[in-house]
């Protein structure tokens, strides 16, 4: 503390010294002068300070000061001093505890050890942020702005002035900026550099890159060249806001400009060169670039402007021109306005709107060279352009001077020029073809103009500007409209001269000036060069005058309309212009116009209006250009020049109009509800609610004044005259039962000039003179009021008597009578007809419930008064009882009120019934319409499905050819005779307007909406797209239901209070022990019931809004997109809470029902309700998936067994004893039991296990383990037995060698199936293995549980249990691999081939095919193929019967009536018999023998119905034998039958004994254990495969490209016609190929197919005896036959990802197929060409240009060609070295 005291003492001393120094400083003269100066300045700004100072001085000079005044002054001074001194308060000292609370905060890097190094590093880091584009931009702009760094910051996005200064001085020595500075004269005074202009910023400002992921695909388009800006093919940015003024674009719209247009325009602007192509020498002083585009040029359509710019040879991002180019441009504009024949013919034949890029020209040359003849139709399809356009470009590139499509008239004849230019420019003159030259031919021969390139001094020009691709072409129908508009405007002589500007050099008819066009072309400049030099001085004076005018005038360009930014245009004295309408809230006053002038012109009444369909596509809407713009803006604040017929017409109207006459401005009727929607019609398309409120004059033949519909009295219309201040007066409500119609003064209707006649049907007015329920109610109330007035004297006497008894009650009755009168007045007002045609409200307002007359006892105010204690309610009835007269009067009064209430209730009931009937009728109509639509949709769908089924096979055969043709040339779906609109891509229409694929042309198809590029049809700020319209509609529906919910809730609360009041009032009356009237209580009860019923209806009505709002919430998840008010959001929250509370009991009930259903399905007998709802576990899902896999595996085995056994139906000489083969899927009854949906599942057993006691759990676990072991041993024994009998070829003493086994495959192919197992890899790795065996590894094995054996091994080939488990896991992995059915069929076809594969052998010449001869079965036999799925009712009955095994089936087969049903049933029986041994196939043998007999004797009668009847008889005999048999069934069959019955009837499980239940549990435990083991093996195999796939492949030199999509590649085969068109096979399948599972198909008979027999070739080394190749029923397109070399083979179709050459599974490949080690360069390699599709997806990496902006990754992957499609691919022989 002593240290603190010393510190405090030192502080006080220093503070005192500071105060002394401060006082001395304040007394100095400098301080006083400073204070005096600032005091004077402050007092001049704030006079009250001066008054306060003078008051203080006056009080100080006073001799006597009163005590109170002195105190107040001193207090005020003290307060001021305290305020001044309290600004900086002295901080207090810290205490000991606060000082101990200080903690040390470590901040690494806060101490700089080497400041110079850190500073240098920071500078380098800041310099590294500069991209190359930013560096070049800074260097180019530095030369113009020197060191105005704050101005240079305008060109950058994220750079400050300090960054620019640092960059400048750090690169000053290396870049040498001073060499680019313009040399200036030395001046004495420093002159500030020029700040960047608006035009310069428009060209050079760097904009942030676009986030293409936030925009729809191919939705961004360059505003100038109309090419797609997607960030891959073409980059672009948003246009700077400064460019909107330069290019005359609406500032409310965001426009995109591509990088090419910006670079081209910036290059021309930087060099200060003319944008045109007609000036030959810009060094001349007369050709300075200082002329803007004429102001009227923006009024032309896009097509006309593109035509003029191409004729001028100018780029389309044009801003300024020289004098010759400007004169030529003005002359052509006048020719178009005057509709000269020559230029109109050129305009009609104009097709050069879209320019050709260099890539397109190269592609055109390639297509022409590849075409044997000049087939322009096919070339145009490849180019995505019109044939005529391709031919024109071809002629232009070859320099062929044919008849040009566009002819330009450079100037008049030389004779006319020499004579002094007497001929006018607009007069068409005939000239020879030699005097004219084609603009397209001249521009095609000119090279690309480069900046700062010197131009030739004399002769014609040889260089020109490259025209860019332009806007969307104008369709043919729009061109016709444009011609019609020109013809209409041609009737007005003065309208055609309104487009000449003041600064134009073109001749004019008004001033009669001669033509000054001598220097507007290179010819005129070359001929009159000397005259130009002599007239330099005169031209300079004219240019200076024109420059002054052009500076003030806004800059106009090609694709820009008039500026809508609200600025005023320059007012030219000779031709006054009409101001464009502004988008601001206060529009400027329009120009006056004569209302009667139109009648004197044509004698027609132009009171028609143009109807605009808001839902129409933008391309078909009338654009506000030329003659249609004044139609849209007819009811707005002004118009353009063309809206009033051109400048000449405007001037003529102003001259003919008297001075005193002034036309009234247009009138706009707006209501309070539509105040926010007030906007100009020509700026935005009117919405239905706003557009309907504008005055619409109807077209009539008589002089009937227009009728305006006045809105209801609630929303009094306010007539606002544009240009004048609105007068706000007191709104007075007028009531009239009839329709309110007021004539509008003729002066308020704006005149329309040069408007084509439009027929507008007037809106029919609905009559309201008929009687309505509301009017009848009004008359009834009026009669009641008259009766009450007649009874008023009697009631007054009663009231006097009542007042003597109870004055308070009398006052209450008087108040109630006043309320009744007010209600009647309100009803009278509500009964009047009010409404509006425009707003959509009905003329007959419905009566609200709260407006009805209420009864005395049901009134809330009356009940509240009666319930109040101060009125002494019990005393009143006693007083009435004492006077019988008063009692009678009271009863009469109550009865009257009851009658009134009854009438009111009846009226309300009638209205409610009418409303319900209307709603029911509307709902019925809507339901009928929906049913009709559904019926039509179903019929259309059925029709489409039928057509699709008919065309399936044809499309399949043409699929391969169509795919190959699609890669090169797309098919021409649109005939060549159909002429598409100009600029529309044919391929785009072929793909149904879906630009999903990248076009081959650099110019994209013109599928953009015209509203985005056309001048007159731009998308206004108020117009929304489809999504916004949908959101708006949803918002309206949402608000409508929210308000309905709010109203119903309020009504429900009101009814609830009413019910409570009635209950309370009834209880009080009954408790008062007074004699009361039963009728009153009856009425109160009735009212209570009505309120309760209404509340129930309200609850039902609230369900629909709640469901609708819940659906909207599920769709959007957030209501912020609708921008609701706070009250609506609260109501929305209440609705959702209410809906959730209502749905919660239903959800709980559903969960409980599901739980009870699950318990009922349990066969163990669990009935306890305390168990929770059982959820599906991952283990259960895995078991279900495994069951499905088992079913598929079982079907695959049966199909293969059927194919193998049907082929070997012929009896053998020495038949081996048949042993019953029990498959895994058939021998396990527990497995079939578990597959039943209602069977006991593992989760049920788990519940039982948890419910046991600990001792019982251990016992049950031991039993389970024992049973599992016994069951596994039994299954293993059965499987080994099956393998032994299925694979035992002969006795062990007669074992054959490997070669002999291969040779004996034809005799017993079923015995050699095991060679396809995994253990046969030893044989496959060597030589002499059949390719069919090697190829069979890529598909599933054919026999369950069969292990492969080695031929050269000394053992018998039987595998152990571990081998079996391993093989089972491998088979599961192969069988259930997600493969396409098409690929499965292809593999099946490949299996049938026994040819030699060069990929499987080292030397293909050592093995050759040996063919035994034709098959024994005739090729013409027709066979019935087995099918599984039923198609008819008989088939379904047959399937249910066949589901029971034959040895357990007690019922016989029902007979059928038709041949088709018999064929279906027989095919299903054949399918079921295929699962059984060959000895049990009775039906199959019967059908085969009948078919063979029919084939041997074609004349004999053959019918499948007779065969089926024979089968039915045999089945009946079998049933009789089973009934007569008394033998005891075997235990296994007995168990199967019992389990089958238990599956069909699960309820029998409850009747079982404990021992039977325990047995079932044990079987279930066995099945669960087996499934878990198989699932674990399957998961292990999948994990192993995933690890192998994820293993990095360092084999880079011969790495095979494997795209994600399935690739069809060739596989060798010797059978030429391996794919047939027939749907069924005529011969049996091969021995080594399984039959894959097919979808259910109808039994069909295939026609006999000729079989091509391969020739037999002798083999010197090894003879491989194989089965003859057979075609398969594969639904694939027919592939072309590939001719091969003698050692080559034809190709088949397969999947590249098969295990035959899969590098990802090296352990499954033979040694010669494994890839070598990464470092081993000596090992041989096998190369396989996988370029099958011709395209491989390659991701293009885009470098980040701006590090500070986060760019989303672009998901679009360009397609990179790696060669043509696989055609005529021939495999070469691969030697060992290769």
UniProtKB/Swiss-Prot annotation:
Entries under PROSITE patterns matching the protein: MYB_LIKE, SANT
Chief place of localization: nucleus
Outcome of gene disruption: Mutant animals display a progressive defect in locomotion starting at the L2 stage, showing delayed response to prodding, irregular thrashing movements and a low pharyngeal pumping rate. Worms have shorter body length, convoluted intestine and develop gonadogenesis defects including loss of spermathecae, sterility and larval arrest at L4 stage. They also show abnormal cholinergic signaling leading to early onset of paralysis in the presence of aldicarb, an acetylcholinesterase inhibitor. RNAi-mediated knockdown results in enlargement of mitochondria in the body wall muscle.
Biased amino acid composition, Low complexity: 431-442, 450-469, 626-639, 649-671, 1276-1285, 1687-1696
InterPro entries in the cross-refs: N-CoR_corepressor, SANT/Myb, SANT_dom
Gene Ontology CC: chromatin; nucleus; protein-containing complex
Compositionally biased intervals (Basic and acidic residues): 494-513
Domain SANT: 125-176
Residue stretches of biased makeup (Acidic residues): 409-421, 478-493, 517-545, 599-616
Protein's UniProt keywords contain Hydrolase: no
A GO molecular-function descriptor: DNA binding
UniProt keyword annotations, A-Z: DNA-binding, Nucleus, Repressor, Transcription, Transcription regulation
Record domain Myb-like: where: 356-398
UniProt record, GO biological process: regulation of transcription by RNA polymerase II
Cross-referenced Gene3D superfamilies: Homeodomain-like
Record has DNA-binding as a keyword: yes
Tissue expression summary: In larvae, expressed in pharyngeal neurons, ventral and dorsal nerve cords, tail neurons, egg-laying neurons and egg-laying muscles. Detected in the neurons of the pharyngeal nerve ring, head neurons, tail neurons and egg-laying muscles in adults. Detected in male-specific tail ganglia and rays in males.
Location(s) in or outside the cell: Nucleus
Region listing for Disordered, in residue ranges: 409-671, 992-1024, 1195-1218, 1276-1339, 1414-1434, 1646-1718
Function: Mediates transcriptional repression by certain nuclear receptors. Plays a role in development and neuronal function. May play a role in muscle-specific oxidative mitochondrial metabolism.
Assembly behavior: Interacts with gex-3. Interacts (via C-terminus) with nhr-60.
Family, similarity comment: Belongs to the N-CoR nuclear receptor corepressors family.
Record protein name field: Nuclear receptor corepressor 1
The organism of origin for this protein: Caenorhabditis elegans
Higher taxonomy: Eukaryota, Metazoa, Ecdysozoa, Nematoda, Chromadorea
Gene designation: gei-8
